[in-house]
Structures are given as structure tokens and as C-alpha cells.
Design a protein with these regions (language model features):
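Active-site rim/adjacent substrate-binding subdomains
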Residues: 1-143, 148-191
Length: 191
């Protein structure tokens, strides 16, 4: 297994829709193992193919819920359905409960409204189908990682005033162009 460089916002692969995985072989399983190692070292709760420079529809996740249940796996060619979310215009964002970050916008956290529930259907790295009905934080993780597969970063979904704040942070860090990455275990994501 190897730790992979995590691409930073501005890298073209992060801003383009990923393609379907068509070959389920040892190379795919090695990529998934490397993604787990990278995510764990970062540390993160999810990591999508585009974040490590692979424009394919797959992500890994690892999160322990309030009951101590570990949710860990790989989702290849996922489909995600979500429940409706309450618009920010009706209910203010909770900066503690709804704040999230992204390994491709390292060191930054902002509140973002997500759906409370999600249904994930995918196959694993061996091509075995599975389905997970997720609520709360796990639903948030799935939505965040699924967005990456469509070329959307959480920073793209932020509303005022957070959208302006994240753009300022991106400019201050000199991100936003191709060729920037960081390596978990070597680089500190907050500079």
C-alpha cells in the first residue's frame, strides 16, 4: 500500500465529472487500499478518486457512529438518493453541527446544509453490490464524497457569507490552479 498525494482545489480532475469504473481487477483493489491508507493518515472520513488524481467514480469512507458502529467501505459507481434538506432561508445553519471540511481544501471548515438522510447503492472493489440507508453524519459523508464524483467541491455549495470566506481562504493559500497537492504524513494540511 502507498500514501497518495491529495489534490487541492483548482486541479482539473476535481472539477470535472468522473467516469464509470469498468474494470474490477487487482489494480482497482490496490487503488482502494491506497485510498484507505491515505484517508486514514490524512485523517479523513472519506476520500474520492478525483481527490487522488483518479477521475473514476469511486470513494472510500470510514466513520464510527454514536453507537460505536464502524462504517467503512468502498463505493464504486455509486448512486445516491437524498431526502429534502431544510433551506437556509428557513432555518439558520448551525456552525457546530453542520460544519464540514474537505481534504482538497485543507484546513478550512464551513457550515453547509446537507440532507439528513441518504440511500447509497454501489458495488465494492470486488464488484459486489450493496445498499446503505444513512442518516446524520454518515449521510453527510456520502453526499460530500458523491459530490466529488460530479466535479463539485463542498466550497462550491457554500452560501453567503461562507462562500466569500472560502474564496478568500483559497486565494490567501494561493490555491485554485492545477498542480497543487499535499501528502498525508509528510505535509501539514494547514500550512
Amino acid at each position: 500500500m502507498a500514501v497518495l498525494p491529495i489534490r487541492i482545489t483548482g486541479e482539473p480532475v476535481l472539477h470535472a465529472p468522473a467516469t464509470e469504473v469498468t474494470v474490477f481487477d487487482d489494480d482497482l483493489r490496490t487503488l482502494v487500499a491506497d485510498m484507505f491508507e491515505t484517508m486514514d493518515l490524512a485523517p479523513g472520513v472519506g476520500l474520492a478518486g478525483p481527490q487522488v488524481g483518479v477521475g473514476q467514480r469511486l470513494f472510500v469512507y470510514s466513520w464510527t457512529d454514536d453507537d460505536g458502529v464502524l462504517w467503512r467501505g468502498a463505493a464504486v459507481n455509486p448512486v445516491l438518493w437524498t431526502t429534502p434538506a431544510v433551506p437556509e432561508s428557513i432555518e439558520e445553519l448551525d456552525e457546530d453541527d453542520e460544519s464540514e471540511g474537505c481534504l482538497s481544501v485543507p484546513g478550512e471548515r464551513f457550515p453547509l446544509r446537507r440532507s439528513e438522510g441518504a440511500l447509497l447503492r454501489a458495488v465494492d472493489e470486488h464488484g459486489e453490490p450493496f445498499e446503505i440507508e444513512a442518516h446524520g453524519w454518515l449521510a453527510r459523508v456520502f453526499q460530500h464524497e458523491y459530490d466529488h464524483l460530479d466535479g463539485v467541491l463542498y466550497a462550491d455549495r457554500l452560501v453567503h457569507p461562507y462562500a466569500k470566506q472560502v474564496q478568500k481562504a483559497i486565494r490567501k493559500a494561493s490555491w485554485g490552479g492545477p498542480g497543487q497537492s499535499w501528502l498525508p504524513g509528510r505535509d501539514h494540511p494547514e500550512g
